[in-house]
Amino acid sequence: AKAATWVAHAKAYADAYALPTKELGRGVPEQMLMMNVGRPEGAFESQFAGYPAIVYSYEYVDVYVVNGMIEGWNQKKSIKENLAETAIASYAKAYELDPKSESKVAAGVLNLANALAIQADALNNMGKVAEAAAAFELAFRAQQVVPAIKADPNNLYNAGMLTTMHAATLQGEEALAAFNKGEKIFAD
């Protein structure tokens, strides 16, 4: 297959990854949520970072609104498993086949890395530390696909720190495995 085919494949997977949350952003007014995403399937009261929140429930995501502003979200399900990982691998294959495709690959991996970092931040704000760490690590890995892109070390630092924080909540072999993973991330 040609590099362009791999870029198209990667873009489809990256777009599918971002789709459930692409209209969301912290600090966006509740009214914009309703205009951009539509009416939720339901709503209920909850807490977000210690504050009272209204949670608007959609098929793929719960959106947390505090004082009329989106503060976070929890993606309940994905369109398909491993979308981001598949997109990263496809972009890498495209670049491997044709290094001249660098500008298209770079644009795609940067968009994906940004979506992953935003999702990681949302997960961290929800207290989902392990999932946030994984998303930050994927954001960093996406940025490494094209050598011309300077991968953001903050993503790797966040991944390592959150992995270590998660490990501190575990016991026995699980804790050891998580600490080792955090150490490996920091070694990169």
Where is each model-derived feature located?
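Conserved alpha-helical positions within TPR/SEL1-like repeat arrays
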Residues: 157-161
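Short coil/linker segments at helix-helix boundaries
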Residues: 12-130, 138, 143-153, 166-178, ...
